[in-house]
């Protein structure tokens, strides 16, 4: 060995080579990664037609990472639906999961007629401005996918890669009627077990989730109430149902002009038993507009929860293909 090689060996920290050495180093690596895998609660102040409101969001990953993934939930859900997906992608992205106004930790609007896509899209633009990035990747489930389509169709959009989870350019009237049957309810539950039974009932189309996943969804779907009635209530504004009552939809909603204006790479996901995204619409999404890649998940209705390994892997592969 030359003198130069000897000096390099002496002054350079050696990598662990034996199993015992690697075992000693690994806990330190795990500890260093832990902050990235812990959710951080944040909020942003937004402006609506009748005043200001706060939109809460959960953030994962390195806070200074310029690669940002925004994950937006369905109509009565919240950003904690994406915890499993966020953990899986926190090493590559700063993952941001908002609670759309009226849900989760976000404020409720005083004028219930303001609940709608103009406010939702404006709030997401404000959120992205707060994140201080020019571009984002987007995963949207159901309503979150519609918000994503609307934003991605605009000139100058910040969305450069789009995942549409069980939603497309045609929203069936039948599915909206089904959703309208429960969205305006304000059920109370005596205990978490009763709440979980309800979540399992209305969430039956989500597919075969584990007991732990159902408990997770329940934990973030209800909160303990301190009023006279007590018990547990859903963490969304029952006033969301007023939109359905005031504006009943007798026919399917056609968003093809919006979809065909999208220019970024797009992945469309569908639960094989979905009543919201019909097979013909799903197939056409692969041929029109951004010509989406299409993946269908068996044994699932509306909507895949992106909690199991296969669903997460599908989303991950598509998103990181653009890295």
What is the predicted role of each segment?
Residues 300-309:
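Catalytic histidine-centered segment of alpha/beta-hydrolase-like enzymes
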Residues 58-105:
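Conserved HGGG/HGGXW glycine-rich cap/lid loop of the alpha/beta-hydrolase fold
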Residues 1-69, 91-93, 310, 316-323:
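Alpha/beta-hydrolase fold catalytic core
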Residues 223-284:
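Conserved serine/cysteine hydrolase catalytic core
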Residues 49-51, 84-87, 97-139:
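Active-site loop/oxyanion-hole signature of alpha/beta-hydrolase fold enzymes
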Residues 99-104, 168, 298-301:
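Short beta-to-alpha linker loops that shape the active-site pocket of alpha/beta-hydrolase fold enzymes
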Residues 190-249:
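Conserved alpha/beta-hydrolase catalytic His-Asp/Glu region
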Residues 134-173:
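Conserved hydrolase catalytic core segment
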